[in-house]
Amino acid sequence: RYFFVKQTGGHTLYWDSKTGHSNLTSKHLHQSLYAYTDFGENDLVKRAQRIVEMTTFKPIILESIYKPKQARVVQQHDHWHPNDWREPELKPDPQADSKPFVDHLTRMLGNKPKADYLIDMLAYRYQSEDNTKPHVAFYFYGGQGFGKGIFSTTLEKVFGESAVRKVIDQNALKSISSIDVWKRTWTIVDEVDVKAGSTDYNRIKTMVGGSTFDAERKGEHFKSHEIPAQLIMNSNHA
């Protein structure tokens, strides 16, 4: 549960994988041990201190990564990182009736073959163990009441909130932190208006077609980032 972060000001700081707190001192660890001990009150503090002193804590790098279906803490390139993915609250139910959702997609997209294609893609991303994205983006256009919002909400419920990144418009795809927009299973952009051949169009095309990308986030050097998110664009324009 606890990982070593760093030494600062004469204190050792720890990260708690359960709460996400990253500035815990040894006293916090002592307090958590009190609830799991059966020795007398007089020995309580000394025993807790001894346990912490004799424990080797794995060092963690606090830059989180996104790894679906893996533990709260994952190892990558010999380093331990917090995992942003969380298991969705909604569980698969073989007895559930999928017809309302299929009918909704059929009406939204105009025909059954298009709905079937989208459903196959959703099933692949849900069942995939390695989170490798197909180099396919979706562009849904239509006026109010078209059903785009219902689809986005359903996606969030099925895959879990941690798997879906929702942004207001395409400006988020070109900000200094845009690389983080792609570190999910799905990225949903509302109010898109992109013209073929434009700078935004070419940037989106590049990101959709790649699985890793070199970028310089604010305060960081250039380095390689995984970008597993598949893009869904909603628009009122054809």
Predicted feature locations:
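N-terminal nucleic-acid engagement/recognition segments and initiation subdomains in replication
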Residues: R1-L109, P113, I179-V181, F213
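Short secondary-structure junctions
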Residues: F4, E161-K166, G210-A215
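P-loop NTPase catalytic core of nucleic-acid-dependent motor ATPases
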Residues: Q70-I188, K195, D200-Y201
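Residues at helix-coil transition
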Residues: Q127, G160, G209-G210, N236
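AAA+/SF3 P-loop NTPase mechanochemical coupling elements
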Residues: S177-W182, E216-N234
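Conserved nucleotide-binding/hydrolysis micro-motifs of P-loop NTPases
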Residues: D193-V194, N236-A238
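Conserved catalytic/switch belt of AAA+ P-loop NTPases
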Residues: Y201-K223
